[in-house]
Curated annotation (Swiss-Prot):
It catalyses: tRNA(Thr) + L-threonine + ATP = L-threonyl-tRNA(Thr) + AMP + diphosphate + H(+). The gene is thrS. Its cofactor is Zn(2+). Signal peptide: none annotated. This is Threonine--tRNA ligase. Belongs to the class-II aminoacyl-tRNA synthetase family. Zn(2+) binds at residues 287, 338, 459. InterPro entries: aa-tRNA-synt_IIb, aa-tRNA-synth_II, aa-tRNA-synth_II/BPL/LPL, Anticodon-bd, Anticodon-bd_dom_sf, DTD-like_sf, Thr-tRNA-ligase_IIa, Threonyl-tRNA_syn_edit_dom_arc. GO terms for biological process: threonyl-tRNA aminoacylation. Keywords: Aminoacyl-tRNA synthetase, ATP-binding, Cytoplasm, Ligase, Metal-binding, Nucleotide-binding, Protein biosynthesis, RNA-binding, tRNA-binding, Zinc. The keyword Membrane does not apply.
Length: 608
């Protein structure tokens, strides 16, 4: 933040034309014997109370030294070339005004933000009448650290005992220990190159070098995996046993909309801004679209609870050096489910089932979660038994972070972490109980007494983002390899489920007939018709992690059977209909997608 102090005998201003979509009411004003604070809010400035107290303290100190009887906060964009976004600047100026007003024993005024203004000023011309300052948010950092220390952590066991994380016995809880070291004691995460990164290339998960940092591209194998997870997220959402409405919408929203602006402020500087005729933000989750739609629905208490799901392309401006393939991205896909409930009691009841499904789904990968429950102090005091019940359902201790104050739109924010092959906690799934956004966006329902009420909203990503779910899948493969096992993707998620390899050209027709049958059953199958040796074809299929390799020669054709090499499961001969049944059994309850590649390997470019 840059400021110019002018001690003025008199100062007046009058708004003329709007300069921004985001603006205050156009009020005129004047002051005598005033310290005029021309203020430019810069990128990186935040509406943090400790930072603003530091700025206000300097303003008031100067006002006292020059014996000013009034202070005027005047938005002035011409002191810096690195300005904050309008919504941030406006919030910072408004909060600075409130802090100065609460501490200065005199008149405090503020000129409106977002206008071209005419002003007249008469500077008093003494040695302290013209001063400049530059402030950085770091100046309030020590106070912020002290405020953060008012947050506290406890470990709650399934029988309701409460423990200090520093004194807890972690002998049987290695994953919890890893989470506590990261979250409570801020220890550095384990180093080293994660093994899963080696796997991604073969499936076509890559950075896009011609885009912004943190943006990926997805080859055909990666694309089918992504879309299968997207499809599966809807199946999982419906398994909650409530009505679920799947929607689609835009990824850009106007910052001039009050609800959008106030919600965006909660997210801070990680926003993607698009400069057009008006300032737009790229959504960081599906909240904006779903809430904008729900506010137009006529909802009765009889409809609740219900869910809205969108596979939202989401944008978060992560630091370039922090982006990681599949895990921390600037653009990703979020199967974002919002569940609308009558009140907090019903929301808590719904989350019991939600909690069960979240653990069920990670369990299907052979993994489990270690949980961090972020709660407001009021929720913790009033609903501690609810947290104990969730710990009981998990069958192990949970970490709880208690946050004082009411500065959050949620009362509960749960993070579900796996511990990766390097021993690092990695958040995958989540849910929140939101008590603020229904009112912010004007989402209402009519209760049984014909009264208008605001629903309590559960935000959840049951599987996590699409990419993070796949990250968990590939990290599981890394753990398998570390344990000396053969990594094997779930059959439903394998880009190619069966590869048919004819021993010779004479067997190609039979191979095609086998592929036709499998394809008709919704199985993703391809044929290696290249002019390569049989051993190389088998080796390439194994390197590609194909779950089932079918080798057919003249003998198999004569006998009407197929020779199968199952990944991690040996070799055997069976009839084709038996293989179809086996694949159907393995993929029951999961979505189907066709092959996104030419069926014949000879038709693929060398990248494949």
């Amino acid at each position: 933040m840059r400021v110019l102090y002018i001690h003025a005998e008199r100062f007046n201003w009058e708004p003329r034309d709007p300069a921004l979509d985001i603006r205050d009411e156009p009020t005129s004003g004047n002051a005598n014997n005033a310290l005029v604070v021309f203020t430019s809010v810069e990128r990186g400035d935040v509406p943090d109370e400790n930072f603003l107290r530091a700025v206000a303290s300097d303003i008031i100190d100067v006002a006292k030294k020059v014996k000013a009887s009034a202070i005027v906060i005047y938005p002035y964009a011409h002191l810096s070339s690195d300005l904050a976004r309008p919504y941030t600047a406006r919030e910072v100026l408004n909060k600075l005004f409130e802090v100065v007003k609460s501490q200065f024993n005199g008149e405090v005024l503020k000129a409106p933000f977002g206008y071209y203004k005419a002003f007249e000023i008469k500077c008093l011309g003494h040695p302290l009448s013209e001063l400049s300052r530059s402030f950085k948010p770091e100046e309030g950092r020590a106070d912020r650290r002290a405020e953060e220390r008012r947050d506290y952590y406890v470990i709650i066991t399934p029988n309701g005992e409460e423990h200090d994380p520093a004194k807890f016995n972690y002998a049987n809880y290695g994953d919890l220990k890893a989470l506590v070291e990261k979250e409570v004691f801020r220890k550095e995460l384990g180093g080293g190159e994660p093994k899963y990164l080696e796997y991604l290339r073969k499936f076509g998960f890559e950075w896009e070098p011609m885009s912004d940092a943190g943006h990926m591209r997805y080859a055909p194998e990666a694309t089918v995996m992504m879309e299968l997870v997207e499809d599966y997220s809807y199946i999982v959402a419906k398994s909650l046993g409530i009505p679920v409405f799947k929607i689609r919408g835009t990824n850009m929203f106007k910052l001039s909309e009050k609800a959008i602006e106030s919600h965006a402020r909660l997210f801070g500087e990680r926003l993607y801004i698009v400069e057009s005729d008006t300032d737009l933000i790229l959504r960081y989750a599906a909240c904006f679209q779903q809430f904008a739609m729900a506010k137009d629905w006529v909802i009765s208490y009889k409809h609740l609870p219900f869910g809205m799901l969108e596979i939202a392309d989401s944008y978060r401006h992560e630091q370039p050096g922090e982006t990681v393939l599949l895990f921390r991205l600037r653009r990703f896909y979020m199967p974002d489910l919002h569940i609308f409930t009558k009140d907090l009691k019903e929301a808590m009841e719904v989350t019991y089932k939600l909690h069960e499904v979240i653990f069920r789904e990670i369990g299907k990968l052979g993994r489990t979660y270690v949980s961090l429950y972020n709660v407001t102090e009021g929720f913790y005091k009033n609903h501690r038994d609810y947290l104990v019940e969730l710990a009981r359902r998990e069958g192990k201790p949970i970490l709880v972070r208690v946050l004082p104050g009411q500065k959050y739109y949620w009362v509960l924010n749960v993070e579900f972490h796996i511990v990766d092959e390097l021993g690092r906690p990695r958040e995958i799934a989540t849910f929140q109980i939101d008590v603020g956004n229904a009112q912010r966006f004007g989402i209402k329902y009519v209760d049984e007494n014909n009264q208008i009420k605001y629903p309590v909203i559960i935000h959840t990503a049951i599987l996590g983002s699409v990419e993070r779910y796949l990250y968990a899948v590939f990290d599981t493969m890394a753990k398998m390899e570390k344990e000396g096992k053969v990594p094997r993707l779930p059959t439903w998620l394998s880009p190619v489920q069966v590869r048919v390899i004819p021993v010779s050209k004479e067997n190609l027709k039979y191979a095609i007939s086998i592929a036709d049958v499998l394809e008709a059953e919704g199985i993703r199958v391809d044929i290696d018709d290249r002019e390569e040796t049989l051993s190389k074809k088998i080796r390439d299929a194994e390197t590609s992690w194909i779950p089932y390799i079918v080798v057919v020669g003249s003998k198999e054709e004569a006998e009407g059977v197929i020779a199968v090499r199952e990944r991690g499961g040996g070799q055997y001969k069976i009839r084709l209909e038996e293989l179809v049944k086996k694949l159907k059994d393995e993929t029951r309850g999961y979505p189907q997608r066709p092959l996104y590649l030419p069926r014949l390997l000879s038709q693929r470019p060398s990248r494949f």
